[in-house]
Amino acid sequence: MSTEGSAVETLTIEEAAAELERLAREIAHHDALYHGKDQPEISDADYDALKRRNDALEARFPELIREDSPSRRVGAAPSVTFSPVVHARPMLSLDNTFSQEDVQDFVASVYRFLGRMPDQSIAFTAEPKIDGLSMSIRYENGRLTTAATRGDGTTGENVTANIRTIAEIPNQLPKGVPAVVEIRGEVYMAKSDFLALNRQMEAEGKQTYVNPRNTAAGSLRQLDAKVTASRKLKFFAYAWGEMSDMPADTQFAMVQTFKDWGFPVNPLMKRLNSVADILAHYDEIGLKRPDLDYDIDGVVYKVDSLELQQRLGFRSRSPRWATAHKFPAEQAFTEVEKIEIQVGRTGALTPVARLKPITVGGVVVTNATLHNEDYIKGIGNSGERIRPEEHDIREGDTVIVQRAGDVIPQILDVVMEKRLAEVKPYEFPKICPVCGSHAVREVNEKTGKMDSVRRCTGGFICRAQATEHLKHFVSRNAFDIEGLGSKQIDFFFENEDPSLQIRTAPEIFTLEKRQQDSLTKLENIDGFGKVSVGKLYAAINERRSIALHRFIYALGIRHVGETTAKLLARSYGTYEAFATAMKEAAPLSGDAWNDLNAIEGIGEVVARAMVEFYKEPRNVEVIGRLLDEVTPAEAEQPVTAGSPVAGKTVVFTGSLEKFTRDEAKARAESLGAKVAGSVSKKTDIVVAGPGAGSKLDKARELGVQTMDEDEWLALISG
């Protein structure tokens, strides 16, 4: 059951773990699109909502914080197009604030942390938040040596050659600067230059660009620096990384020093001493925003004193001494021409509004997500009303559309004054528009609440689900078959020729054999050719042996993301052991079921989804045919020669004082142990810290070896 609409307080620990798994996967996907490909597909507001949901879950269930948690990372992994650069100091992101109350809370938290009274004034800087690409530029002995993108905050992309083409960035600094200087700032494209570039593209009959931010990022990632040079990119300096000697002791003075060294700095930056002044400057910048020749999406506030910044320090991914006050998303009015239903891999029916084209924030918008059936009716994910009942969205309505840097914006509200009498309420389909199967809304057995998503029950007989499943199967983190992308999958799926048809995963691996005796050769079809077909067959054959976690992930089991697949592979070791365990766990009781639930990071929601998947004969039959073609490799185990805990199952409970829970888990796994989240007959060791409760009691009841943290350290160190 989906819990994404449920209040955090109502979730069980298993439901929270399942949702954190989903959020980690979903946020990582959007990070990769935004930071790695410059192709965001959701709005900033929706992205921020995902992050806030993740933070709320982690605050309530701190023991569930994952190693791949979005709260522990910045941006996306660097691409492989450019060589990697490890930042001398991490490039962290900023926490966001969205209201005056949020800003007041931020300032109050600074005063509290420093033990300052309100009458002991602390100065802040306030400057526009440029909507561009973050950059770190390193100078040694005054000469530009390296320029790198933010990447994941630790490692970025080397774009030095392209940065040298930006006229505003000096290649040589004045005499007397520190030996090592890292200037950080934002590369952007001016609005006027963006419009001129699009006029040029139109004149040449080429596709125009979406927005200045994406265009700047794409221009900076050109393999040919001449292309970058032609794009007239610009730069604002506002921060620093490694600095061998600090030329000033305040944020404001540091930025003014950058200006003296020849860097452009934003003229709207101010030093202010009160919340009222900060908010007034925010409003002032907001009023100037339409007339600026560059895009901004908020105002950044920083504690001015570098000494106080040092005392305030950092959280895991952001400084305590800074925040970004975001502007509201841009809005416009247009008409809903049609509501269409898309069917995804898991059968979810997602409504999309086709809009009368409208320009919002410099981008032509023709589609808007409607999320689900309830959203159309004005009901939020938690069952709360987000619009008056009569403000349901209908075909023919005039609506308010919001866009915040996304490709598919969202509809906020209906303009009732413009609703025509003949406009009728939208009837959400109860039958899948693709396969004709029933589409149902499940009820969460624990909360009794209806799931906000309606799903097709057709499974693999539904073409939409089948094609999306195949696309998932060949995706990068699954089988990763080069040359078999979305368009190719659609071609093979729709083809009626038995020698070309691919409708299940095993048929990918029989394609070459079927083609040998066919009169219809793939190489003779437009879009393929002999060379590309040869490469496709080679890519397919390269995947006849595959890592176990990739195989499990590729199966497309609901709730089983890449991280969960790795946990399962590490726990079971072989596919045979995994499949046997799933079958033995079918009664939802017994040792196999308990062992599955005991795996750290696997809760009842995920476990139930896996067991249900293996109960379906069609799934078992398809996997059987797949195993005739493919061999999942045994999961790699850490080298643990001489380890006293190799092969043992360990449970940590209570408070740990010398390690964080993640550190203890990582250390145990590096020594060959399996870390479980609950105690069962197969548990070998329970490490109990202060506050240990029911897990320790159960361990004693079962006769499992127990020890405190010091005894555990002595064991693994001996």
Curated annotation (Swiss-Prot):
Active-site residues, record numbering mapped to chain: 129 (n6-amp-lysine intermediate)
GO cellular component, one term: cytosol
InterPro entries assigned: BRCT_dom (IPR001357), BRCT_dom_sf (IPR036420), DisA/LigA_HHH (IPR041663), DNA_ligase (IPR001679), DNA_ligase_AS (IPR018239), DNA_ligase_CS (IPR033136), DNAligase_adenylation (IPR013839), DNAligase_N (IPR013840)
Annotated keywords: DNA damage, DNA repair, DNA replication, Ligase, Magnesium, Manganese, Metal-binding, NAD, Zinc
Top-rank taxon, per record: Bacteria
Region forming the signal peptide: none
Pfam family, one: BRCT
BRCT domain segment(s): 640-718
Catalytic reactions on record: NAD(+) + (deoxyribonucleotide)n-3'-hydroxyl + 5'-phospho-(deoxyribonucleotide)m = (deoxyribonucleotide)n+m + AMP + beta-nicotinamide D-nucleotide
The protein's Enzyme Commission number: 6.5.1.2
Binding site for Zn(2+): 432, 435, 456, 462
Cofactor entry: Mg(2+); Mn(2+)
One of the GO biological process terms: DNA repair
Listed GO MF terms: DNA binding; DNA ligase (NAD+) activity; metal ion binding
Binding residue positions for NAD(+): 44-48, 93-94, 127, 150, 186, 302, 326
Function: DNA ligase that catalyzes the formation of phosphodiester linkages between 5'-phosphoryl and 3'-hydroxyl groups in double-stranded DNA using NAD as a coenzyme and as the energy source for the reaction. It is essential for DNA replication and repair of damaged DNA.
Family named by the database record: Belongs to the NAD-dependent DNA ligase family. LigA subfamily.
Protein name: DNA ligase
Lineage: Bacteria, Pseudomonadati, Pseudomonadota, Alphaproteobacteria, Hyphomicrobiales
Name of the gene: ligA
